[in-house]
Amino acid sequence: MNIQKFLLKKIHRALLAITNESFFHLIQVQQSTKRKFGNYQINGLIAISKKLNIPIEEFAKKFIQFINLNDVAHTIKIEKPGFINIFLNTKWISNQINNIFSASHLGITPATPKTIVIDYSGPNVAKEMHVGHLRSTVIGDSIARVLSFLGHNVIRANHIGDWGTQFGMLIAYIEKNAQTRFLLNKTIQLSTLEHFYREAKKKYDIDPDFAELSRNYVLKLQKGDKHYRQIWKYLVDISILNNQDIYVRLNINLKKSDIIGESFYNDMLPDIVSDLKNKGLAVTSNGATVVFLENYHNKLGTPFGVIIQKKDGAYLYSTTDIACIKYRCKVLHADRIIYYIDSRQKQHLIQAWEIADKAGYIEKSVLLEHHMCGMLLGKDGKPFKTRAGNALKLKTLLDEALERARCLILSKNPNLKYTEINKLAHIISIGAIKYSELSKNRITDYIFDWNNMLNFEGNTAPYVQYACTRIFAIFKRSKQPNFQLKKNDIQLETEEEILLAICLLQFEEMIVAVSNQGAPHILCSYLYKLSVLFSSFYENCPIIKAHNTHIKYSRLKLALITMRTLKTGLNLLGIKTVRYM
C-alpha cells in the first residue's frame, strides 16, 4: 500500500476534470509534519491557480469538490495560503491494515524490474580493511537489499583494488628479499602483507631504481607474465580470504563471486584505447595516449587531458574505469549504476563517464549515480584513527564493539549462559555499528560515539531491536494461534492504535523513497518512529488484558504486523533481531 501514490492518482483525475490539463508535475503529496495538519498535505495548487488565473481560494474549493476521497478521508481542509490537508478515515485505515495482514511481502507492490549494478566496498588488496571502508560497505549492502526486496535484478559489484602500481612495488620488494620469498610458501597474515606494502612504498618513494623496477613489474603483470601473475594471485587470495571474514561477521551480502576487480578489465584495455583512437577521442601527446575534455580545464585554461595509456605502454585507473562502465552497460545491460565510493573520486569518475558517453558505451536511458559518503570522525572532529594516528582496522573496531556489548548484556542479564551472552553480543554489536552508520545522512560527516551507539534509548539499533523483543514477549505470554488472529479484523479505537496503523501503512512509500534516493537513513528514521509509536501503543493500550476478546485479537494483530515490519526493515539494513535482550 502506497498512500502517496494512491492520493496522486485521485489528484490527477481531479485536475483533468477541472482543467483538461493535468499540471501533474506541479503537485506534491507529502506526509504532514504536525498532527493539526492531518495525515497528508497536498502542495502545488497555488502554482496551478496562477497559471489558470483563478484565485487560489476559489480553485482550492473547486479542487476539493472534484477529488473523490469520500471513503478515504473524514476531513479535507484548506490551509492558507493554499495547501490541502487530508485527515484519513479510521475505517479506511482499518481496512487497509487488515489487507496488509493477509498479504505477502507486507503488501508491497513489486517494482517494474530493472537491472541495477551497485559498486560498493571495494577494498584494496594487500591491506586490511579499516573504518574508512565501513560506510560504503554497509550503505551499499543495505541499498542492494532494498532494491532486491522491491523485485529488481541487483548485481553487487565489489570493485576491489587488485591491480596497478602497488603490485609492482610489492612484487619488487618480495623478489629482492629472500626472506619474503620464503614466506610465500606459507600461509601468512594480511597484516604481514600490509607491512611489506609499507616498506615497499618507502623504498619506492626514495629509490629511483626500485621505482623503475616496480613500474617494469606492473608492465609484466599487464602483459600476463606467468611467474608474476602467480605471486599476484597469491597476494589477492590472502586479501580476499580476510575480507570475506569481515563481510560474514558484518552480515554483508558480498560473496567471492561478486568480486569484479580492476584486474578483470585488463584484457579489455587495448581494445578500449584502440577504439577511442579510431573514434578520434584519443590522441598522442608527449608519447602518451590522452583524451582531452573540453568541459574541464587545467590552470592554463586549456582542455584537461585524461591519460589512458602511458608512453611506456602501461594503462591507468581511468582506462580501467572506462572499460568497467562499458562492461556494465554493454554486457550486464545495466539500467542504473550506483557507485558508493569516496567523494575524492568524484571528478575522476565523472571524467570517465564523459569519455565513455562520448564513445557511445552508455545508453541514454542508463542512470549513473555517484552517492558520496561523508567521513567517520573521532570526538575531536578529526578522521577517526588510533592513538598512533593510523586508520583504525575494521577488525579492531568489531572486536571492541563485541566486548562492549558483552559487558552491557552481562550487566543486564547476569544469569545468562556464556554462549548466550556471546550470541547476543555479536548480534547487538554488529547491529549497533551498522545502524550508527546507516542512520546518518550518508553525505554528512559524523562523530563516532560508543555510548550513543549501544544506547537502548533514541534512534539506535538496540532501541529498535528491543521493540521486537517486547512483541516476542507478548506472543509468548498470550499463546494465541495465528488462525484466531485471521478470524478477527483490526478495530482501531484509540489515537495510539490509529497512529501506529498509519505508520505501518507508510512502509511502502518509505521503501520507495529509500530506493530512489539510495539513502538508508530514511529507513532508520522510519523504524525509530515505528518503535516509538509501538511503545506508546504498548504503554497505553492493554493487549493481553484488553477489555474484550475482539479488542485483544485486534491489538495482537496490530502488534504482529508491527513486528513483521520491524524485522523486515532491520533485515533490509542487514541487522538481525533477537528474542530477548
UniProtKB/Swiss-Prot annotation:
UniProt short sequence motif 'HIGH' region, positions renumbered to this chain: 123-133
Main enzyme class: ligase
EC numbers, comma separated: 6.1.1.19
Keyword Mitochondrion in record: no
GO cellular component, one term: cytoplasm
Main location (coarse class): cytoplasm
Subunit structure: Monomer.
Record-stated family: Belongs to the class-I aminoacyl-tRNA synthetase family.
PANTHER family: ARGININE--TRNA LIGASE, CYTOPLASMIC, ARGINYL-TRNA SYNTHETASE
Protein name per Swiss-Prot or TrEMBL: Arginine--tRNA ligase
